[in-house]
């Protein structure tokens, strides 16, 4: 495009998400803009494909060392146990997660565990759109007001206030990276929190920098100043887009 070569790369965030790699035709300088991304394995998102760049502009949603997520196997077990425990006492397990991305990942996890589910209309429509675009995830069943026995229900978080009073005998779980903090159940008003995230955690953010090998890094979104400070400690040139970086002194 004009004086630049543009390339889209899989971000690993959700199905179809992409990063942008830019090379100047004039001097060969390169830039990688990640947008939201993750490096962890996924059933529905394409595998992240980082490549080297001179400048890295990266999201740092979870850019502090206390944000390190469990592996996918452990997350799957938490989801399975929550659903089966709810079934065992005659309750409906309800998972609250975004309609696009996380809901499709959850459907894949539930399907692998042999747990059938019904989905809110918005979740169902997003899933069908992903399937039309090539995502290999089951279509699921659209919620019609009733949840069959031994079925889980998938709802967007912003529909919970309206929908939950209609579902007697239910248990709720929020699926969010912020669920790593035990206080998340109070923030989201759920029975449990499960830290299924479609963002890179602290270790993945550092690994992304290692793979890209940039000369300079700009952090955007989340703990931008904190992660930029961590990178400067590791001898990178790194700055928060928000500014007001606190410079470190070697004493």
Identify the residue ranges that each predicted region occupies.
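Short helix/loop capping segments that flank catalytic or ligand/cofactor-binding pockets
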Residues: 17, 41-43, 65-67, 104, ...
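His/Asp/Glu-rich metal-coordinating catalytic cores
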Residues: 1-94, 101
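Binuclear metal-ion centers of metallo-dependent hydrolases, dominated by the metallo-beta-lactamase
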Residues: 50, 64-145, 216-251
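Conserved beta-strand elements of the Class I
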Residues: 7, 21, 32, 94-96, ...
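Metallo-beta-lactamase
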Residues: 1-17, 23-25, 128-154
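C-terminal regulatory/interaction regions
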Residues: 112, 140-251
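Active-site metal-binding loops of divalent metal-dependent hydrolases
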Residues: 14, 35-37, 60-62, 100, ...
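Generic "edge-of-domain/loop-turn" microfeature
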Residues: 13, 27-29, 102, 124, ...
């Amino acid at each position: 495009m004009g004086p630049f070569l543009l390339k889209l790369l899989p971000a690993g965030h959700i199905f179809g998400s992409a990063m942008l790699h830019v090379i100047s035709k004039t001097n060969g300088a390169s830039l990688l803009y990640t947008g939201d991304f993750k490096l962890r394995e996924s059933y529905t998102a394409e595998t992240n494909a980082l490549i080297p760049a001179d400048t890295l502009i990266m999201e740092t949603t979870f850019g502090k060392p206390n944000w390190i997520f469990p592996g996918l196997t452990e997350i799957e077990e938490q989801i399975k146990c929550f659903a089966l425990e709810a079934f065992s006492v005659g309750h409906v397990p309800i998972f609250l997660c975004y309609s696009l991305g996380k809901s499709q990942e959850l459907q894949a996890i539930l399907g692998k565990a042999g747990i059938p589910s019904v989905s809110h209309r918005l979740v169902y429509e997003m899933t069908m759109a992903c399937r039309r675009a090539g995502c290999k995830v089951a279509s699921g069943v659209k919620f019609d007001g009733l949840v069959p026995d031994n079925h889980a229900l998938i709802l967007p978080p912003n529909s919970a206030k309206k929908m939950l009073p209609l579902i007697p005998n239910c248990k709720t779980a929020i699926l969010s990276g912020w669920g790593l903090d035990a206080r998340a159940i109070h923030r989201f008003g759920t029975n449990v929190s499960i830290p299924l995230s479609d963002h890179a955690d602290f270790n993945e953010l550092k690994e992304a920098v290692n793979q890209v090998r940039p000369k300079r890094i700009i952090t955007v979104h989340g703990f931008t100043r904190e992660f930029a400070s961590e990178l400067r400690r590791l001898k990178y040139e790194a700055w928060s887009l928000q500014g007001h970086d606190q410079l470190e002194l070697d004493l």
